[in-house]
From Swiss-Prot:
Record carries keyword Hydrolase: yes
EC id: 3.4.21.-
UniProt protein name: Alpha- and beta-fibrinogenase OhS1
Keyword Signal: yes
General function of this protein: Snake venom serine protease that possesses potent fibrinogenolytic (on both alpha- (FGA) and beta-chains (FGB)) and amidolytic activities. Selectively cleaves Arg-|-Xaa or Lys-|-Xaa bonds.
Stored PROSITE patterns: TRYPSIN_DOM (PS50240), TRYPSIN_HIS (PS00134), TRYPSIN_SER (PS00135)
Pfam families: Trypsin (PF00089)
Similarity comment text for this entry: Belongs to the peptidase S1 family. Snake venom subfamily.
Gene Ontology biological process terms in this record: proteolysis
EC class (word): hydrolase
Glycosylation: residue positions: 44, 79, 117, 121, 250
Regulation: Completely inhibited by NPGB, PMSF, diisopropylfluorophosphate (DFP), benzamidine and soybean trypsin inhibitor. Not inhibited by EDTA.
GO cellular component, one term: extracellular region
Length: 260
């Protein structure tokens, strides 16, 4: 079912501290300590629940369904049980979603910008990721990363983020797996044979192609990494005008039409 990952994530969130909307990366490997400098750790009093991507000194990009009332953003994290000298913590100064009501709980356009309460200092473990300059090419090998589950449906969470390389697939592959989904503003990515995927806990994190963020982990099938059930990602390129407008201070900028 198209929304089953999100629903399962919400259920797990009630049961476990590290439970976020998606499991950990399936079929991947430990990320190098210095290759995820833009990856941020979103948590609250209940624990870790999502990831996000640092775009510049004061803006983070994540999924709208990662919205919470008491978000804290930790930057410069690798091993969650270790405190790093350059680790920094921020809270939202402002949260912006595509919906005219700023209702970040809708799943229609799963994208959210967080303006941080103070500027972030770049460091050995902290650096921004570039927005896409072009649309991703079909078949491109891209990397998704996060602290989500390593196994599914069994619950095994990592202390360090994991990475996995997957392919950009034709949107019809995901539409065949999830008949109710729209093709608007979404990317389909994974491997057709299964075994590699993002999952609960990876929500909001980046799908990186050629050192640019092309996707935001959104939803997919559950259990994760099944045959012919790729992941679904928010297509960042379709929101470039909105993202750049908001960051530039243009409060009148609008998202692509949400008429699906």
């Amino acid at each position: 079912m198209a929304l089953i990952r999100v629903l399962a994530s919400l259920l797990i969130l009630q049961l476990s501290y590290a439970v976020t909307p998606f499991d950990r990366i399936i079929g991947g490997f430990e990320c190098n300590e210095y290759e995820h400098r833009s990856l941020v750790h979103l948590y609250n009093s209940s624990g870790f629940f999502c990831s996000g991507t640092l775009l510049n000194h004061e803006w983070v990009l994540t999924a709208a369904h990662c919205n919470r009332d008491d978000i804290q953003i930790k930057l410069g994290v690798h091993n969650v049980s270790v405190n790093y000298e350059d680790e920094q913590i921020r809270v939202p100064k402002e949260k912006l979603c595509c919906h005219s009501t700023n209702n970040c709980t809708q799943l229609g356009q799963d994208i959210m910008l967080i303006r941080l309460n103070s500027s972030v200092n770049y460091s050995e473990h902290i650096a921004p990721l570039s927005l896409p300059s072009n649309r991703p090419s079909m078949g491109s090998v891209c990397r998704v990363m996060g602290w989500g589950l390593l196994t599914s449906p069994e619950v095994t969470f990592p202390k360090v983020p994991h990475c996995v390389d997957i392919n950009i697939l034709h949107i019809q592959v995901c539409q065949a797996a999830y008949p109710s989904m729209s093709e608007n503003y979404l990317l389909c990515a994974g491997v057709l044979e299964g075994g590699k995927d993002s999952c609960k806990g990876d929500s909001g994190g980046p799908l990186i192609c050629n050192r640019e963020i092309q996707g935001i982990v959104s939803w997919g099938g559950f259990p994760c990494a099944q045959l012919l059930e790729p992941g679904v990602y928010t297509k960042v390129f379709d929101y470039i005008d909105w993202i750049e407008g908001i960051i530039a201070g243009n409060t009148s900028v609008t998202c692509p039409s949400d008429n699906f």
